[in-house]
Amino acid sequence: MKTRPMKSDWIATARTLSEAVPFLRRYDDAIVVIKFGGHAMGDAEAMASFARDIVLMRQVGVNPVIVHGGGPMINAMLAKLDINSDFVNGKRVTDAATIEVVEMVLSGLVNKRIVQAINREGGRAIGLSGKDANLIVCDPADPALGFVGEPVEVTPDTLLQLVRSEIIPVIAPIGTGREGETFNINGDTAAGAIAAALKADRLLLLTDVSGVKDAQGKVVTELTVENIEEMTAAGVIAGGMIPKTETCVTAIRGGVRAAVILDGRAPNACLLELFTEHGAGSIIRRG
């Protein structure tokens, strides 16, 4: 016996596809840099859903470039190895022992899990870090924090070659120093720097929040750089949202057309943001 979905389901699907058509044209051959992080990384189904979305984006002509984090996995491995961390103003000091673990976890464990998830869904992904082909060269972000880097040079040639070959780059936020040191880079910061170097059409920061909120706690769906600066000065944007919006503003000033902060835990968040009228988070434009 064979059954069919209700007619209302067919109509809803048709409407969704119809709505997506102009956006599919809009993003054909566009480069979209996506920072994958938050709790979605630790959930197998969320990881698989993300991978399917990325593969679909590639199949319809979008060029996704993935940058990932991995803080919880790093914490777990440091605890397992009984390596204690010092903190300065709430930020981890990354000493010589810690940076080895950070690189091992980000490049060797987290990166390959994401690559494998994408390839399992039919995509072609390749994993690399900011060290490969001198992709990201760093200076120390703060000497007191040890091997934590701030990108000063991004060479995107290798990424462009991969994108032209319809391969999905997956990048671990590890950079190299001017003297050959290894640096850990904040994932959002790395994604923003790479997006600017690629002159990406979009930078998507997947987080554990639904977007930038106003003074009443409601998500603001569209903002300008000036709005961000005003809300930050007024204390409306505060705490952990400040570095995320700063990353977006810096990327936009560096040549990215727009940046979006959205909830990576929501199903199909990237697809909803790119291919629907409503979007899925807070989009920031130059103004």
UniProtKB/Swiss-Prot annotation:
One GO cellular-component annotation of the UniProt record comes to: cytoplasm
Q: What is its main location?
A: cytoplasm
Q: Where is this site: Transition state stabilizer?
A: 35, 244
Family, per entry: Belongs to the acetylglutamate kinase family. ArgB subfamily.
Which GO BP annotation is one of this protein's? L-arginine biosynthetic process
The first-level EC class reads: transferase
Q: State the organism's lineage.
A: Bacteria, Pseudomonadati, Pseudomonadota, Alphaproteobacteria, Rhodobacterales
Listed EC numbers: 2.7.2.8
Name-wise, this protein is Acetylglutamate kinase
User: Cross-referenced SUPFAM superfamilies, in alphabetical order?
Assistant: Carbamate kinase-like (SSF53633)
Concerning NCBIfam families, the annotation shows: argB
Pfam families, per database record: AA_kinase (PF00696)
- Give the catalytic activity: N-acetyl-L-glutamate + ATP = N-acetyl-L-glutamyl 5-phosphate + ADP
Query: Which Gene3D superfamilies does the entry link to?
Result: Acetylglutamate kinase-like
A single GO molecular function term of this UniProt record: ATP binding
Intrachain disulfide bonds? none
Keyword vocabulary terms for this entry? Amino-acid biosynthesis, Arginine biosynthesis, ATP-binding, Cytoplasm, Kinase, Nucleotide-binding, Transferase
Summarize where substrate binds, as residue positions: 70-71, 92, 184
Origin, by domain of life?
A: Bacteria
Species, as recorded = Dinoroseobacter shibae (strain DSM 16493 / NCIMB 14021 / DFL 12)
